[in-house]
From Swiss-Prot:
InterPro entries: 1Cnucl_rcpt, NHR-like_dom_sf, Nucl_hrmn_rcpt_lig-bd, Nuclear_hormone_rcpt_NR1, Nuclear_hrmn_rcpt, PPAR-alpha, Znf_hrmn_rcpt, Znf_NHR/GATA. GO terms for biological process: cell differentiation; fatty acid metabolic process; hormone-mediated signaling pathway; intracellular receptor signaling pathway; negative regulation of cholesterol storage; negative regulation of inflammatory response; negative regulation of transcription by RNA polymerase II; positive regulation of fatty acid metabolic process. This is Peroxisome proliferator-activated receptor alpha. PANTHER family: NUCLEAR HORMONE RECEPTOR, PEROXISOME PROLIFERATOR-ACTIVATED RECEPTOR ALPHA. GO terms for cellular component: nucleus. GO terms for molecular function: DNA-binding transcription repressor activity, RNA polymerase II-specific; lipid binding; nuclear receptor activity; RNA polymerase II cis-regulatory region sequence-specific DNA binding; zinc ion binding. A zinc finger (NR C4-type) spans 109-129, 146-168. It comes from the Eukaryota. It is found in: Nucleus. The gene is ppara.
Length: 474
């Protein structure tokens, strides 16, 4: 038996990292590709980087020493001395710089729109589609033809392999397009520009949708309400051709009842006392406004698709808040318009009426003065009223997520609209949110007062529709 002599005193040859010139050589490229192929074996056995084996049960697919999955590190450990201060790192085919670029740019896979992990086979792709394409090419797989032209997305990319491979080819994946090294600055700049342009396109599309929503709501507002702020302000400021008839005492009230609201007081209440007649007229006006608000709500995108019970609930709790918000448009510090703007009843006369009916309108005037100070126009009010109706926190709602989604869209477009329409008042939006809370309190107090009137005023019958709204409200 011959003896092998080993010179233990000779110096070991320390391996050094490869230079750029070495990496650019064809031989190095082939060697590195072989290393990449070994690294990706476990990823390509199962789609999307997963394997049919559990790593804990089959350690040769894990990262244990000597395993295939850790060949990059273990190969280095085998070739270099134990005392070596550093290990060799082989660049992946896509390049760590490109992987970092993909992550920083949030690029999507060109095939399935999942998050791209790098530049694979000529396009930015995710690990799943990279492995799928490599497996198909290497194994020369042929898939059953599909004529449905399936849409390939992250959630369904494994369902139709034929269409997935066709998508890979259509977006430009090619086995000959493997690239080594860093992403050129010019290409990175181009990618950044594309991402920014894509983001801007998305923002522009979202803005267009919001503007469309605002326009639909505003058009519905103008269409469904007999009185709006533009008309009311023209009358209240004396710009209308026919000034309203002023009701300031019992005599002028009787005159108005014979002309302006003759139909309202002709149903057997003309002989009742003034407070009862006024309460009756207020109810008639409220019923008409509830009808207008119902038609307006139906024009809000998505409202009629809601559960019917939810539609009723939203209107039940929202109509009076919306009504009092719009009532402010026909009010000033001295009084309010009535009879479609043909009459004007003074604030002092309303306060002089017998209690509790005499207490009914004063809280609305106090709210209106503060609300009118915000100087909203009809486009602002239309969105505000829509937001009041579509509130997802009303009691008894069934499909809350859908309603909250509607409300979120409306409130968002309201905020953007206020920023555009009132650029000098940055606090207008939070002020309006506070007004929503104020309106809830106002409606609660009004409902309590109506119940008091119902109990104490035997002649003051409540309209059936309003009675249904008030039932179990608060």
């Amino acid at each position: 038996m011959s003896t092998i002599m080993v010179d233990t005193n000779s110096e070991l040859c320390i391996l050094t990292p490869l230079d750029e010139d070495d990496l650019e050589s064809p031989l190095s490229g082939e060697f590195l590709q072989d290393i990449v192929d070994i690294q990706d074996i476990t990823q390509t056995i199962g789609d999307d980087g997963s394997t049919p084996f559990g790593a804990s049960e089959h350690q040769f697919f894990g990262n244990s020493p000597g395993s295939i999955g850790s060949v990059s590190t273990d190969l280095t450990d085998t070739l270099s001395p134990a005392s070596s201060p550093a290990s060799i790192t082989f660049p992946a085919a896509s390049g760590s710089a490109e992987d970092a670029a993909c992550k920083s740019l949030n690029l999507e896979c060109r095939v399935c729109s999942d998050k791209a992990s790098g530049f694979h086979y000529g396009v930015h792709a995710c690990e799943g589609c990279k492995g799928f394409f490599r497996r198909t090419i290497r194994l020369k797989l042929v898939y059953d033809r599909c004529e449905r032209m399936c849409k390939i997305q992250k959630k369904n990319r494994n369902k139709c392999q034929y269409c997935r491979f066709e998508k890979c080819l259509n977006v430009g994946m090619s086995h000959n397009a493997i690239r080594f090294g860093r992403m050129p600055r010019s290409e990175k700049a181009k990618l950044k520009a594309e991402v920014l342009m894509c983001d801007q396109d998305v923002k522009d599309s979202q803005m267009a949708d919001l503007l469309s929503l605002a326009r639909l709501i505003y058009d519905a507002y103008l269409k469904n309400f007999n009185m709006n702020k533009v008309k009311a302000r023209a009358i209240l400021t004396g710009k209308a051709s026919n000034p309203p008839f002023v009701i300031h005492d019992m005599e002028t009230l009787c005159m108005a009842e014979k002309t302006l609201v003759a139909k309202l007081v002709a149903n057997g209440i003309q002989n009742k006392e003034a407070e009862v007649r006024i309460f009756h007229c207020c109810q008639c006006t409220s019923v008409e406004t509830v009808t207008e608000l119902t038609e307006f709500a139906k024009s809000i995108p998505g409202f009629t698709e809601l559960d019917l019970n939810d539609q009723v609930t939203l209107l039940k709790y929202g109509v009076y808040e919306a009504m009092f918000a719009m009532l402010a448009s026909v009010m000033n510090k001295d009084g309010m318009l009535v009879a479609y703007g043909n009459g004007f009843i003074t604030r002092e006369f309303l306060k002089s009426l017998r209690k509790p009916i005499g207490d009914m309108m004063e809280p609305k005037f106090e709210f209106a003065m503060k609300f009118n100070a915000l100087e909203l126009d009809d486009s602002d009010l239309s969105l505000f009223v829509a937001a009041l109706i579509c509130c997802g926190d009303r009691p008894g709602l069934v499909n809350i997520p859908s309603i909250e989604k509607m409300q979120e869209s409306i409130v968002h477009v309201l905020k953007l609209h206020l920023q555009s329409n009132h650029p000098d008042d940055s606090f207008l939006f939070p002020k309006l949110l506070q007004k929503m809370a104020d309106l809830r309190q106002l409606v609660t107090e009004h409902a309590q007062l109506v119940q008091t009137i119902k109990k104490t005023e035997t002649d003051a019958a409540l309209h059936p529709l309003l009675q249904e709204i008030y039932r179990d409200m608060y």
